[in-house]
Amino acid sequence: MLDKLLRLGEGRMVKRLKKVADYVNTLSDDVEKLSDAELRAKTDEFRKRIDGGEDLDDLLPEAFAVAREAAWRVLSQRHFDVQVMGGAALHFGNVAEMKTGEGKTLTCVLPAYLNALSGKGVHVVTVNDYLAKRDAEWMGRVHRFLGLDVGVILSGLTPDERRAAYHADITYGTNNEFGFDYLRDNMAHRLEDRVQRGHNFAVVDEVDSILIDEARTPLIISGPADAASNWYSEFARLAPLMEKDVHYEVDLRKRTVGVHEVGVEFVEDQLGIENLYEAANSPLVSYLNNALKAKELFQRDKDYIVRNGEVLIVDEFTGRVLLGRRYNEGMHQAIEAKEHVEIKAENQTLATITLQNYFRLYDKLAGMTGTAQTEAAELHEIYKLGVVPIPTNRDMIRQDQTDLIYKTEEAKFIAVVDDVYERYEKGQPVLIGTTSVERSEYLSKQFTKRKIPHNVLNAKYHEQEANIIAEAGRLGAITVATNMAGRGTDIVLGGNVDFLADKRLREQGLDPVETPEEYEAAWESTLNQIKAEAEEEADDVRAVGGLYVLGTERHESRRIDNQLRGRSGRQGDPGESRFYLSLGDELMRRFNGATLEALLTRLNLPDDVPIEAKMVTRAIKSAQTQVEQQNFEVRKNVLKYDEVMNQQRKVIYEERRRILEGEDLAEQAHKMLVDVVTAYVNGATAEGYAEDWDLEQLWTALKQLYPVGIDYHDLVDSDAVGEAGELTREELLDMLIKDAERAYAERERELEELAGEGAMRQLERNVLLNVIDRKWREHLYEMDYLKEGIGLRAMAQRDPLVEYQREGYDMFVGMLEALKEESVGFLFNVTVEAAPAAPSNRVAPVAAPPGLSEFAAAAAKAQEQTGQGAVATKERETPAPTLRAKGIDNDDTPPLTYVGPGEDGSAEVQRSNGGPRHAAPGGATRRERREAARKQAKTSKPTRRRG
């Protein structure tokens, strides 16, 4: 129903976009008459008009006409009307659904150019580094022609290179790189270490992949935790002793385990504990669940392999080994214990954000994809994005054949090879889509046996695969590819002329970045030559039926199936698609497989005879809809829980930003001092009269905080307040606050004598920043721990989410109170020395890596032009330190681990350099490790200054 409601305004929107395209067309003649210099000068004219108050919406027709003409002059590609419509849809903050081959990459040039004119930056988000670099080079030619600067964010760049790229007018990069830079910026200890400059407008390419498929995996930066645990080994010993359906049950569809009462009693007997579910033992529940999951749900040589004493994950979608990735929440350690290999230490979360909440930071968000309609409800609900289907430039004439279903997988693959051989004989290009590398290799062997030449792609080497995909539409080309392989590159009948021309020029030693002038000079003649050759071949391919897409299995998402089909029939070309299925396929096994098997058995058909039935199609659609709904619920659930963290994250990050930007914190430090002293006094005077108060205990606690200058004996015996019984809480508080203020002023005077004027302000900044970071890390750990066990609240008829929100808020308030107390303690007691004089506060320039020098140079030039160069940076730099606080100003950076979604949506892990990591001593529960972390944080305080 929601889908239908969302589609009600589609027709009106498309008509509105058509009017925009028509208006842009009326300006074409005038723009075509302009010289190159006059066309480039339009950029400066537009910027002046924006400075004068003109709106981007008003500039749209002229800016689009200019960018369209520039693309024609530079790339020999002119935007079709439907691409202009798509560009307008993106500018207005929508998802433009454009079929494969309709030119999404070129479409993006229009809104990127228009929005970059504001000077606030545009981020173009792609699914991998290769596409980011390719698009920055390829489309960057148009933007540079118009006088804009283009940057690209790739993994492995230094902070200086990243900063230069972000200060360009348009920045290309992957979702993970943008997200991790945001998190790192909010871990920075100096303003000049931050690299991003805000979140103005983002265009997300393959928006369904990034905002839907990858949104289940949050971005996490983590560092080594303080201790490992021997509980993994203990539960790995217990799991084989427990019997399935006696001690526990397994749900393969939901991939969960549930422990029966008998199982709980068995574990309690084995461990010698009274109650597994009491608060002190609650961490053991996750160890038990993980051990049983490792036993029942994770199979060796299917889900993972063991190589050289290390557990390596196997990708369920592609079948390849995922080096460097680890399961989270203790699952990987449970498998290591099961396989009796070294159990590596758990990591502690230092910063985290979901992709949903990262992309909601942008003032305006837009996206492009060939398949968004099936996810329109989710895009609207979570991102407030409308989906606008853009008409195709030419009518679609591809023939989508009905599915063929075989009884066995072997029979299915025999039929696939026969079909491909028949097509190869007549020269028709074929693209075979598989769900795993294992199946790709199996098919490859079968093709080799039949002497069918072919290429195999497995979504690992993006650049090499893009080149193969670019030639997959040529006569007789047979290409086997996993679902994700080669995305972002068109399969053009006769070959992709842009890629073939680029390939030929690179073979001649020309490069668009290293030798731009020679490359541009040779581009047009080479392109025309390639076009003529390719068009002749394309006619031959059309004559034999165009590209044939053959799917060997249905994916759990209809979108992925549609993406595979969409490879064929681009731009009105002929084409054909068909899926071959078997009862052994994963989707069929999980849903309704038994019903279909019973039907085939009743029909008594031989294994090699397929059936085509509407019932099969309905069963598949039903199964896919169920899986899509389940995945949507998972993503919604992730977002609901992260929303609690998101509000807290905003408070902490805003506080860090204020500190980094050098805001005077004297008033804030004074308020903290008053709050902490007040809390101490309130705690000591909460009950009874003055004679009942334990002032000795209060004074002992206060002396740990600051050098108290008054004696409580004198206070009680003083004539100022009369008898002890006449001392009021207000009088006591007033005297102690005045005493604390005196001590703080004395501390400030001492520091200024040691390190000069402003030393106390600098210490306040350093202390607050470090304490905030430590307390936030501790809080993230506590919140992880809370979320792990919150599901058990459902057993007590309580809503886990409501409980998480309530307890999470209480923990956050408690953390802020502890933050004040620890900050005040550090400000008084930390040992301080004058900082050694630094030879220079300027950062030495870093050379850009090969292929990126132009981006770095262009960005540096942009900084100068926009006033964000050396002068602007100097104003925003953190002042040079004049003092050093022991235990706080620590330059050592621990090795960090980055977890984010891979292209297939599963978690991908990268580690920064930090030396070898060793497992810490075991034997502690997670709660004990948490306590140890807290104690270590406290003991890191140096010897305090005596008052």
Swiss-Prot record:
Residues 935-947 have a biased composition (Basic residues). The keyword Cytoplasm applies. Keywords: ATP-binding, Cell membrane, Cytoplasm, Membrane, Nucleotide-binding, Protein transport, Translocase, Translocation, Transport. It is an enzyme of class 7 (translocase). Gene3D superfamilies: Helical scaffold and wing domains of SecA, P-loop containing nucleotide triphosphate hydrolases, SecA, preprotein cross-linking domain. The keyword Translocase applies. Signal peptide: none annotated. One of its GO terms (cellular component) is plasma membrane. Residues 925-934 have a biased composition (Basic and acidic residues). It comes from the Bacteria. Transmembrane segments: none annotated. ATP binds at Q83, G101, E102, G103, K104, T105, D490. SUPFAM superfamilies: Helical scaffold and wing domains of SecA (SSF81886), P-loop containing nucleoside triphosphate hydrolases (SSF52540), Pre-protein crosslinking domain of SecA (SSF81767). Pfam families: P-loop_SecA, SecA_DEAD, SecA_PP_bind, SecA_SW. InterPro entries: Helicase_ATP-bd (IPR014001), Helicase_C-like (IPR001650), P-loop_NTPase (IPR027417), SecA (IPR000185), SecA_CS (IPR020937), SecA_DEAD (IPR011115), SecA_motor_DEAD (IPR014018), SecA_preprotein_X-link_dom (IPR011130). It catalyses: ATP + H2O + cellular proteinSide 1 = ADP + phosphate + cellular proteinSide 2. One of its GO terms (molecular function) is protein-exporting ATPase activity. GO terms for biological process: intracellular protein transmembrane transport; protein import; protein targeting; protein transport by the Sec complex. Monomer and homodimer. Part of the essential Sec protein translocation apparatus which comprises SecA, SecYEG and auxiliary proteins SecDF. Other proteins may also be involved. NCBIfam families: PRK12904.1 (NF009538), secA (TIGR00963). Part of the Sec protein translocase complex. Interacts with the SecYEG preprotein conducting channel. Has a central role in coupling the hydrolysis of ATP to the transfer of proteins into and across the cell membrane, serving as an ATP-driven molecular motor driving the stepwise translocation of polypeptide chains across the membrane. Belongs to the SecA family. This is Protein translocase subunit SecA 1.
